Structure formats: C-alpha cells, structure tokens
Amino acid sequence: MVQVVLGEDEGIESALRRFKRQVSKAGILADVKRRRHFETPLEKKKRKRIATRRKRRFR
C-alpha cells in the first residue's frame, strides 16, 4: 500500500505529485487495468512472452 506523509511545510500539490509518482512506480494502475477483464491462460502466456521479448531487446 502506498502512503504519503505530509510534512509541516509541504503543500497538497507536492504531496499529490509524490503520491502519483509512488503509485506509478509501484505499478498499481497497470495492475488494475490488467485485472479489469478476465484474462485467459493463453492471453497470460502471450502477454508474458511479449514482456520477455521487450526485456531482451533493451538489454
């Protein structure tokens, strides 16, 4: 779970920016989008295979 503790002199805008950055870094929104619809085992394998290819290409 992502938490942001507000400092004494910190504004809401900067805390919100920090929260958004932590959420995107944790991959929470990507996970929610992926789980929005049922994914068949074949689709899971295909997604993982594509992700593996991407990782290999950037090495």
Curated annotation (Swiss-Prot):
The Gene Ontology biological process terms listed for this entry are:
translation
How is this protein annotated for GO cellular component?
Answer: ribonucleoprotein complex; ribosome
| InterPro entries listed in its UniProt record | Ribosomal_bS21 (IPR001911), Ribosomal_bS21_CS (IPR018278), Ribosomal_bS21_sf (IPR038380)
Pfam families given in the database record: Ribosomal_S21 (PF01165)
Keyword Repeat part of the UniProt annotation: no
Q: What does the UniProt keyword field contain?
A: Ribonucleoprotein, Ribosomal protein
Regions crossing the membrane: none
Q: Does the keyword Ribonucleoprotein apply?
A: yes
Instruction: Select a single GO molecular function from the record's annotations and give it.
Output: structural constituent of ribosome
Name the family: Belongs to the bacterial ribosomal protein bS21 family.
Q: What is this protein called?
A: Small ribosomal subunit protein bS21
